[in-house]
């Protein structure tokens, strides 16, 4: 049976967790005609979520599936055109579902922020997914759609203007309000560091700027591309003169997703495309000191974690950190916001800025981005790229998301600066 003939357009797996509930809410209130089912391990909890969603979801079917029982995942994937999964940490629970979707030719989107899960998915299932026609799309939330789409916007604009390929390209987190960290986020970071610290080869891979490129020799040699940088804003763009920027905790993951997008598109961004991510720390007298402190702390914490985290007992870590399934309150989500700006210079010297902003917190935004990714895969297939395999958001559905996300409250755009 072809994906278009299947019982469901979208199955949301992990619907009873924190991110799963938020994603289900957005799907229920999206006004979409998509045929949607909720999936998870507990029928009782699934019924509770469906009831919470109200009349729009009253007839959504429920599917029992469990990451520890691969046959249930295969059965679920065979019934769906698209599977969205919020079940993490993906290093522990994700590969069986990737395998099921690759086998069935089912499109897939997740919220991973774990490099080794991404690399293992590519190594094990890229070819099979390409052969069956499946799109396995990684990192469809706050990690890494804003990063990926901002660069894609810049690429599209430079093509339209005929101003050449992208060269030095730098993302800056300009504003961010987030008052709580979810248990799922903590589990993701913990699992990523545990994986790197327990395996020297994994640790080597995650420090390579091209972790997610399997043909490493095909990538251009652009010199050192450090993840954590302390720089005055004027070094990035004249518009940032007076500001200081420092290390951004998500840079080691997002940068590699963006570089994979370039490789998947046959280096359409350019062979001299050089990409970094930082966060703005203001322009006060203390900003240079703050930038140094933040950069040192982030780099030191992740560096030490990638070497030694596996020495910490798993139970101890779980006891002192937020529990999976927990997260900020609804009021806190609505009070949050973020704005990313990405600056680039092209081979002809043209300069551009792309913006990606959302007036909710990162968790609410993540749910919106994942849900809209699912709707794009299910309903906007004429806007999707022809690529198949283990993909990135921009490479697989950049045009579809650029068309969809403004209707979901995301503000995007590009400006030519010179």
UniProtKB/Swiss-Prot annotation:
Keyword Acyltransferase recorded: no
The EC number(s) this enzyme carries: 1.3.1.-
Domain of life of the native organism: Bacteria
Range of residues in the leader sequence: none
GO biological process assignments: DIM/DIP cell wall layer assembly; glycolipid biosynthetic process
Entry's Gene Ontology cellular component terms: peptidoglycan-based cell wall; plasma membrane
Name assigned to this protein: Trans-acting enoyl reductase
Species annotation: Mycobacterium tuberculosis (strain ATCC 25618 / H37Rv)
